[in-house]
Design a protein with these regions (language model features):
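Conserved acidic carboxylate
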Residues: 8
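The feature encodes the CheY-like receiver
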Residues: 14, 56, 65, 86, ...
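Acidic, metal-coordinating helix/loop segments flanking the phosphotransfer/catalytic sites
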Residues: 29-48
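Acidic catalytic/metal-coordinating carboxylates
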Residues: 32-35, 59-65
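Alpha4 helix (beta4-alpha4-beta5 surface) of REC/receiver domains from two-component response regulators
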Residues: 62, 85-100, 113
Length: 129
């Protein structure tokens, strides 16, 4: 089963996103970016990260910056989600290597399709190497 790291500081939304994903994926939940980063640098390598943009302690953008600077972790696709449609933030996230930028609210099916697309893309990149 593919492993997904879900990073979300809103408890209700976190519960909902985990419920959507756990039928198809092994989901690990972290409630802020700092907690997630500590988990990642201890050699926990998920197939995908789904992260909120705006979080206490370490934002989604800071997480993207950390990932892109780490040779072991930079190949992990990350989907950023935000409650704000901000073209500048979207561009910044995509420029930093985010696979997708989703604006809340989004349909559960859309999230699942983006997760599947991101994991397939990672698998193709691994096979190409």
């Amino acid at each position: 089963m593919r492993k997904v790291l879900l990073i979300e500081d809103d408890a209700l939304l976190c519960w909902l996103l985990e419920k959507i994903l756990k039928n198809k994926y092994d989901v690990t939940v972290k409630n802020d970016g700092e907690e997630a980063w500590s988990w990642l640098i201890n050699e926990n390598i998920p197939d995908l990260i789904v992260s909120d943009l705006k979080m206490p302690s370490l934002s989604g953008i800071e997480l993207l910056e950390n990932l892109s600077a780490n040779d072991t972790l930079k190949s992990i696709p990350i989907i950023i989600h935000s409650g704000y449609e901000d073209a500048g933030k979207r561009k910044q996230c995509l420029d930093l290597g985010a696979f997708a930028y989703l604006v809340k609210p989004f349909e559960p099916e859309y999230l699942v399709s983006e997760v599947e697309r991101a994991i397939e893309s990672r698998n193709e990149n691994i096979l190409a190497k």
